[in-house]
Amino acid sequence: MPPRTLADNFLVPGPTAIAELIVFLLILFIFGKYIVPFVNQKLAERQELIRSQFEEAKRARDEAEAAAAEYRAQLQEIRAEATRVRERAHEEGQQIIAEMKEQARREADRIVRAAEEQIQAERARAVAAVRAEVGSLAVELASRIVGESLADVERQHRIVERFLAELEERAQRQPAASDVVGGQQREEVHR
């Protein structure tokens, strides 16, 4: 191995060391004078941008929370209003149902009364027709039995009325089996 010289030692400055030092200091000066302030300015701008974005995000979050609270309050108010509307509609529906039931009941009562009146009128016509028929049959039968003419109208009327009164009296005392319907005695119209 050859002997080492002082020039081989890297710790010992060589002839270019002064030039290297001057270039290094010049680069350091340029960096310190132009590049570092530029980088610091850009870092400060970036820092300011991040800070403003953070504040804006915080403000937006606060506004969103306030809007959410307002939304919840409005939603609660809308739900309460919907409940009131539903209850009012239910009450109105119940009232309408009650009115319709009452109207239907009145209409049914009116129809029943009209039917009863019609039945009474039909019954009265039937009773009158039966009385007339029974009267003429009774007069004819009585004429045959007695063997004399009962042409006198006044006399016929008295006989028929007496005969019908006796029939009605018997019917009231002993209701016939055909007069019982569903366990209840039918009403007899006596006129």
Swiss-Prot record:
InterPro entries: ATP_synth_B-like_membr_sf (IPR028987), ATP_synth_b/b'su_bac/chlpt (IPR002146), ATP_synth_F0_bsu_bac (IPR005864), ATP_synthase_B_chain (IPR050059). It is a single-pass membrane protein. It comes from the Bacteria. Pfam families: ATP-synt_B. The chain crosses the membrane at residues 10-30. The keyword Nucleotide-binding does not apply. F-type ATPases have 2 components, F(1) - the catalytic core - and F(0) - the membrane proton channel. F(1) has five subunits: alpha(3), beta(3), gamma(1), delta(1), epsilon(1). F(0) has three main subunits: a(1), b(2) and c(10-14). The alpha and beta chains form an alternating ring which encloses part of the gamma chain. F(1) is attached to F(0) by a central stalk formed by the gamma and epsilon chains, while a peripheral stalk is formed by the delta and b chains. Belongs to the ATPase B chain family. PANTHER family: ATP SYNTHASE SUBUNIT B, ATP SYNTHASE SUBUNIT B', CHLOROPLASTIC. F(1)F(0) ATP synthase produces ATP from ADP in the presence of a proton or sodium gradient. F-type ATPases consist of two structural domains, F(1) containing the extramembraneous catalytic core and F(0) containing the membrane proton channel, linked together by a central stalk and a peripheral stalk. During catalysis, ATP synthesis in the catalytic domain of F(1) is coupled via a rotary mechanism of the central stalk subunits to proton translocation. This is ATP synthase subunit b. It comes from Acidothermus cellulolyticus (strain ATCC 43068 / DSM 8971 / 11B). The gene is atpF.
